[in-house]
């Protein structure tokens, strides 16, 4: 499988050739990072624009929160690429290509920008497994930043995992794996407790940013979250409570990021359940990397922000105090590069932005 050179060149140049204006320059004590998830269906069209915008905003890294490719069916962008357009695609051939397609067409445009890749539930849809994901994405899961942190925590921990963390610029970034119905496992919970214990006593850590695929339970979007399975609900509530206690004990900032639901929402833990059980932690859903867009949930009016039929990413600006400002950066059809339009055709780009939606009926069973 090959990517058209002109499309790749255009995307890479878009990332590399931007010169920030004075208004975009950050003070020496501020820096930015970019986050989104769910880039199946139309991610090959949308993600190059996200990469270009992340570079323009001087993001130190991009963090993907999982669901890279559909796996249960052929992604529309894969079907619409020049190599496959108008052809009948056998499922086995698609499965063989799917993750390489993601790496080439979605990660490639980030160029030299560091990328952290999280696992989502679509990465474990049969015949795919967590072990296959870990093997394919070993380059990212065992990147020097993650390997160094893992060995600093435990010199015997030589095997990369699908949950991980790293400390950067005073922030402990933590990725939790809730891709299957047995998570959070006791092993992962024990690992997280160790991370939180070290962060509590580490004066250099001023904030936690905890990312995962499905949102923790009892949010305003609980209908497509860790509420979907008993172990998820129980262990997810324990994690939320531990993070609440961490914040109260240390007075350090705590932020929660998820995707899984294909819309943008902030203030997702402003729910009656958490108001009655310890309080709200700042939380966001940003499943806006190219997947079919879903209707907003019934309680979305209680959120600070709630938008659907949008693509984009969350841009975090880290301040010296550890406080992080988050804002949603939308990418529009007009942001699509000429190379991407040429590769996928104007008609398919129009489909992605205008008709890649599933608002009337649920797009899929819960946590499929």
Label the predicted regions:
Residues 1-4:
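Positively charged n-region of N-terminal signal peptides that target proteins for export
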Residues 7-17:
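Bacterial N-terminal signal peptides
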Residues 22-93:
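N-terminal active-site segment of His-dependent metallophosphoesterases
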Residues 32, 76-204, 223-255, 262-307, ...:
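Extended active-site neighborhood of metal-dependent phosphoesterases/phosphodiesterases
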Residues 33-35, 62-64, 117-118, 210, ...:
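Residue-level marker for buried hydrophobic side chains located in beta-strands
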Residues 38, 66-67, 120-121, 213, ...:
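Active-site glycine-centered loops adjacent to acidic/histidine catalytic or metal-binding residues
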Residues 199-221:
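Short acidic, glycine-rich surface-loop motifs adjacent to enzyme active sites
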Residues 303-368:
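A short C-terminal boundary segment appended to hydrolase-like catalytic domains
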